[in-house]
Amino acid sequence: MRIFLLLLLGLSCQAVASDRKEWATLTGCRHVAHKNDDGDSFHVRCGGEQFVLRLYFVDTPETNLTYGERTREQAEHFGATLDRTLKAGARARVFVRDTLREPFTVITRKAYAQGAGREPRYYGLVIVGGNPAAGRWLDEILVLAGLARVKGVAVNIPGGEKARAHAQRLRVLEEHAKQRRRGLWAPGPG
């Protein structure tokens, strides 16, 4: 029991320490297709390093029922059936792959994001487009397409935007997608 508590304490200290790391901006990153990718967690290669990136702020539908309760919660949020939700998860995975065909920028503190797999898994933000100053945030693109909900770990954005302000902007985009019936907000069978 004592070993378990020491291990748990060590892991929690590691998570806190990684949250204090400085932001790193990784340019020229590429999406690496992988069978376990989904819309909010996917493999990337930046320079010589490959890792799984978990987006801050958003949650895309699951692609299978491995996490059945989460998938049911997602379906309820969007007012959709489980089948439609799973199909939207598959669409989100393809949407991200297609959106990230060209090099993009990852902004990360390399804070550990728990998950299955052997590769490192870090929280981060993605700027789509070659120029970070002129690019668009992937989380915003996903929400506006109706393929993600505003949920998950939030963080103050480098450059000064507070987490609360960014999340509020995402909620406005989510309402816009809902009103326009985009993505999983669109009416469908079942």
Cite the ranges covered by each PLM segment.
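Sec-dependent N-terminal signal peptides
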Residues: 3-11
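Small beta-barrel nucleic-acid-binding modules, primarily SNase/OB-fold domains
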Residues: 13-190
